[in-house]
């Protein structure tokens, strides 16, 4: 739901859905930062009225808002903004915070330094997440983004045992789901479930693409995951 209108939220609740993820781009994009706060409190009131609980908050992301950028001043600016958004997330009482480790494109010659930058930023933001009682979850991303496979993702969180993974099922373009589950193990803290064609991210409904969902569910259960089965699908997109 791009715009959290009362009617749409009522439909979600009527469909038997109890938990949602609040995507902070709704507050942050195309608006001055000071408007984020009033927007967030309005959404909080709408969710409470609809009887929906917030499982996770997805921190803002864009091409410019990147915690891995080489420029120290810009990186500090971006991480500081994320810290403010984490404080704002506290009004929703989320159990999980989803964070992108980078944007894109990322050139091969920059990849190493940006992995180091992202890991440092993640450690700092993990402290902010802990302050509001939430677990920071780093999302696997497609194409040239950081965290495009389990090896990179585990490297980003290796020094932070309290940080977990947000497993987006339709972002794996270079790795099989079975191998990802084996490599990440019990570090999965939340998921974004959707289907695709393995050519690019699609965010189709499960069953509309190539993912073996019975196998996916078996492996998810075997990993010890006890959280919400969070869908992240695009309305009206099937090709």
PLM features per residue range, with description:
Residues 1-2, 97-102, 192:
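Short, conserved structural micro-motifs that define repeat-unit consensus positions
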Residues 20-21, 55-57, 97, 136, ...:
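Hydrophobic residues within beta-strands of alpha/beta enzymes
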Residues 22-48, 101-110:
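Glycine-rich, proline-tolerant flexible connector loops at the mouths of alpha/beta enzymes
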